[in-house]
Amino acid sequence: DKQFFYCFVCQESGNAIHFLRQYENLDFVDAIETLASSLGLTVPYENGKQDKIKPSGLVEQAVRFYQKNLNNQIAEKAIQYLKDRGITGETAKKFNIGFAEDKWDALSNHLGKDIPINELEASGLFSHKDNKFYDRFRGRIIFPIRNIKGEFIAMGGRIIDEGEPKYLNSPETAFFNKSNELFGLFEVKEAEKKIASLIVV
């Protein structure tokens, strides 16, 4: 009723915003937005502008598309590659691993033709040449990258046949800065909520 919490173990206390910041490791603005979203509300910003750019919904659509591909016969070689490296189906599912066919337009055809050009460019999923968009990831195992909130913001792709580059990452976008992200951090946080610090080697 008093709208605050108290932990008898660590003596931490505060309001709902403070609790969410500590529990989910969010900054103040992200905590406010998360709470508002859970209530079906939007946070008003001065002049209608947000300080942070939201991840493109196209990235999550691409992740689901590539993830579905991994369950098809077209991904037989990719599945064998993962098995040879000890990556189980359970692990692949946990990390949303997928497969991009070796085609120039598989993803673009899946998404459809009605997506505005600026959204295609902003997503980091396509290459642009001669006024045409081509799938950036082709013939690769896809490893999606999430931010600390669990939103899909980018991906890395490992080629399974001969070709270069062996590894290809999403370019930096308005919502993805490679220097600020760590692959797998969200999954680690979800697996163990009480982790206060990590040592990366």
PLM region descriptions:
Residues 1-123, 152:
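Non-catalytic accessory segments of DNA primases and related replication-initiation nucleases
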